[in-house]
């Protein structure tokens, strides 16, 4: 699933490409892609004729302000959702779910192989967290002042769950997934199986700082591509080649030479170095 850096990369691409994009026509090819109240019919009414304004991101959610005063267009890519910018008319692929055109015939196409991606239209008189309920459950952004070592200490007090599992909890911190949980724990020198409640304030500060650094580096590299992720222009993310541990199970650690372990934790593959994180 695309995580914060990949979603931020998409947000930046959409902000560049769709500046003043006026939606002349919308086609929903798969109705389950529309998750908002009112379904496809309301979604079509809400977006058709609107001008796309500022794009924002909250965790793994994308949101565009629709102008003038037309509400919010929300998107979650889930496992395999991706946007494609099409300037010349072309036949959509089998996995095309939603299509948007402007008056010039340029198309924004939403393609989703696994079909878990979702879109919402939130009317201007509806609270955003009501229109997109998942937003209400999100914890602070990793780059925010609210995400601090004392915050983590309070939230994880007496918690026996592994710190890797805790980092995947979107209610603790928004936008982190398997890739950057593994990478930040390696950078902080913390074993992923450590009970979260046992971490000291100093360790939590190291983890916070490491997470911010790893996410910043990945955003600068355009995110990570291991399977389906592409940016708006179809370009792969480049962070994967820089990864210290993620998907490197059985290979030598780039830092110390110890073989990277790959364990299952809460059903997720977890990669770590027994020496650097010992």
UniProtKB/Swiss-Prot annotation:
Keywords: DNA damage, DNA repair, DNA-binding, Glycosidase, Hydrolase, Lyase, Metal-binding, Multifunctional enzyme, Zinc, Zinc-finger
Zn finger residue spans: FPG-type: 244-278
Lineage of origin: Bacteria, Bacillati, Cyanobacteriota, Cyanophyceae, Synechococcales
Subunit relationships: Monomer.
Annotated catalysed reactions: Hydrolysis of DNA containing ring-opened 7-methylguanine residues, releasing 2,6-diamino-4-hydroxy-5-(N-methyl)formamidopyrimidine; 2'-deoxyribonucleotide-(2'-deoxyribose 5'-phosphate)-2'-deoxyribonucleotide-DNA = a 3'-end 2'-deoxyribonucleotide-(2,3-dehydro-2,3-deoxyribose 5'-phosphate)-DNA + a 5'-end 5'-phospho-2'-deoxyribonucleoside-DNA + H(+)
Protein's organism: Parasynechococcus marenigrum (strain WH8102)
Cofactor or coenzyme needed: Zn(2+)
Family: Belongs to the FPG family.
Protein name, as recorded: Formamidopyrimidine-DNA glycosylase
Co-factor: note: Binds 1 zinc ion per subunit.
GO terms (BP aspect): base-excision repair
EC number(s) reported in the record: 3.2.2.23, 4.2.99.18
InterPro entries: DNA_glyclase/AP_lyase_DNA-bd, DNA_glyclase_Znf_dom_DNA_BS, Formamido-pyr_DNA_Glyclase, FPG_cat, MutM-like_N-ter, Ribosomal_uS13-like_H2TH, Znf_DNA_glyclase/AP_lyase, Znf_FPG/IleRS
Keyword hit for DNA repair: yes
Role played: Involved in base excision repair of DNA damaged by oxidation or by mutagenic agents. Acts as a DNA glycosylase that recognizes and removes damaged bases. Has a preference for oxidized purines, such as 7,8-dihydro-8-oxoguanine (8-oxoG). Has AP (apurinic/apyrimidinic) lyase activity and introduces nicks in the DNA strand. Cleaves the DNA backbone by beta-delta elimination to generate a single-strand break at the site of the removed base with both 3'- and 5'-phosphates.
Keyword Ubl conjugation belongs to the record: no
Positions annotated to bind DNA: 95, 114
Active site per the UniProt annotation: 2-3, 60, 268
GO molecular function annotations of the record: 8-oxo-7,8-dihydroguanine DNA N-glycosylase activity; class I DNA-(apurinic or apyrimidinic site) endonuclease activity; damaged DNA binding; zinc ion binding
């Amino acid at each position: 699933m695309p995580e914060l850096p990949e979603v931020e990369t998409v947000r930046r691409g959409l902000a560049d490409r769709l500046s003043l994009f006026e939606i002349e026509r919308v086609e929903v090819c798969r109705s389950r892609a529309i998750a908002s109240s009112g379904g496809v019919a309301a979604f079509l009414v809400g977006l058709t004729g609107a001008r796309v304004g500022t794009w924002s991101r909250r965790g793994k959610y994308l949101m565009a302000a629709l102008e003038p005063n037309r509400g919010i267009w929300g998107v979650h890519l889930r496992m395999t959702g991706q946007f494609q910018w099409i300037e010349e008319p072309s036949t959509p692929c089998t996995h095309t779910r939603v299509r948007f055109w402007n008056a010039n015939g340029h198309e924004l196409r939403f393609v989703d192989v696994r079909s878990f991606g979702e879109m919402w239209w939130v009317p201007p008189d509806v609270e955003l967290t009501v229109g997109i309920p998942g937003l209400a459950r999100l914890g602070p952004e990793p780059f925010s002042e609210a995400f601090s070592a004392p915050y983590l200490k309070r939230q994880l007090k007496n918690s026996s769950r592994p710190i890797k599992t805790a980092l995947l909890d979107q209610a603790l911190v928004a936008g982190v997934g398997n890739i950057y949980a593994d990478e930040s724990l390696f950078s902080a020198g913390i074993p992923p199986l450590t009970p979260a409640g046992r971490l000291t304030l100093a360790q939590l500060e190291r983890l916070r700082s490491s997470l911010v650094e790893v996410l910043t580096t990945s955003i600068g590299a355009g995110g990570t591509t291991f399977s389906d992720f592409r940016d708006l222009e179809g370009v792969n993310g480049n962070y994967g080649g820089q990864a210290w541990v993620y998907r490197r199970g059985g290979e030598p650690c780039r830092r110390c030479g110890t073989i990277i372990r790959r364990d299952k934790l809460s059903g997720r593959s977890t990669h770590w170095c027994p020496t650097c994180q010992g």
